[in-house]
Amino acid sequence: MSIAIETGLIIASIIGKHTDKMIEGLVNNTEGKTACKNWKTDDWGGYERVLSEEINHEIGKENTQRLERINGIVRQQTGRWHRRQNKFAKEWEETERISKLVISYYNWIWENSRLGTKAAERAELTDKKWDWHDSATYPTIF
């Protein structure tokens, strides 16, 4: 998962095992959405193999709590939404689709109880309060 730390906006997400191919997909998906050249990651060696030389790569636990909290919210909501859909499909692609819906919900509809704002508002992508109807009629899924 690729997150803008200042706003909490989820920029990109890839579902799968930790492989170089997965990291390449995450990097490619993130690069098209932001000009950020600073990556803070864990100590997994795949990042060093995949990230280009122009990217400032820092290894550390800084901001880990925020990333893990967002990851936990997305995992919990994906599990809830997926259980409601199990009678229709038990495929990996279904989990991926539901995860994209959950991330869209998190970015545009879910309001942070402490800050009182949504990630898209903090990133200045909108000044409007979004609801399910807005999300369904406007393409927000990445």
Question: Which residues does each PLM region occupy?
Answer:
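Residue-level recognition of single "structural anchor" positions
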Residues: M1-F142
